[in-house]
A protein has these predicted regions:
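Short, internal strand/loop/helix patches
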Residues: 48-98
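Extracytoplasmic/secreted proteins, especially bacterial periplasmic and envelope-associated proteins
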Residues: 12, 19, 42, 46-49, ...
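Thiol-based oxidoreductase modules, predominantly thioredoxin-like and allied folds used
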Residues: 28-42, 59-69
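Thiol-/selenol-based redox modules, centered on thioredoxin-like
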Residues: 87-134
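Extracytoplasmic/periplasmic, Sec-exported soluble proteins
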Residues: 5, 9-12, 39, 63-66, ...
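Short, flexible turn/loop "capping" segments at secondary-structure junctions
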Residues: 26-29, 55, 103-106
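Short active-site neighborhood of thiol/selenol oxidoreductases, capturing the structured segment around
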Residues: 1-17, 33
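Short hydrophobic signal-anchor/transmembrane segments that target glycosyltransferases
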Residues: 16-26
Length: 134
């Protein structure tokens, strides 16, 4: 989860993920999915421009937007990258900004642990799982 205008952790996270992308982008079973945490500003067109600026193939790295409540619920419940207790009463007051990545298999199951996208050692922990798709 990131947002295109983030001046803090998002650029570092996405640069780390781009290294993973570069290593595995030619694998047929490899796909990165990044969700915006700011759907009010990050429209599909804005995300497409962002992907283009990163120089990635959007068939291999997908940038998604949607309804804020659905995006945040997915982060907390499906991916486990934010504590469900962080939910606030009004979704408009909620802001999920996390440096964590989840490795999800093609069946939608989170594999392994949740990884800190700011730490090189954490990113390296993804490699054994990704090598299995080769």
């Amino acid at each position: 989860y990131f947002f295109t205008t983030c001046p803090n952790i998002c650029p570092s996270m996405n640069n780390n993920m781009k290294k993973v992308y570069e290593e595995f982008k030619d694998e047929p079973n490899f796909l990165i999915v990044s969700h915006t945490c700011d759907p009010k500003r990050d429209s599909a067109a804005v995300l497409k421009h962002y992907a283009d600026s990163m120089g990635v193939n959007t068939n291999k790295w997908v940038f998604l937007t949607g309804r804020k409540d659905s995006l945040y619920n997915m982060a907390r419940v499906s991916y486990g990258i934010d504590d469900p207790k962080n939910i606030v009463a009004n979704i408009d007051d909620d802001f999920l900004h996390s440096q964590f990545f989840a490795l999800v298999d093609k069946k939608g199951n989170v594999r392994g642990a949740v990884y800190d996208g700011l730490k090189k050692k954490e990113i390296e922990k993804l490699t054994p799982y990704l090598i299995k798709i080769k």
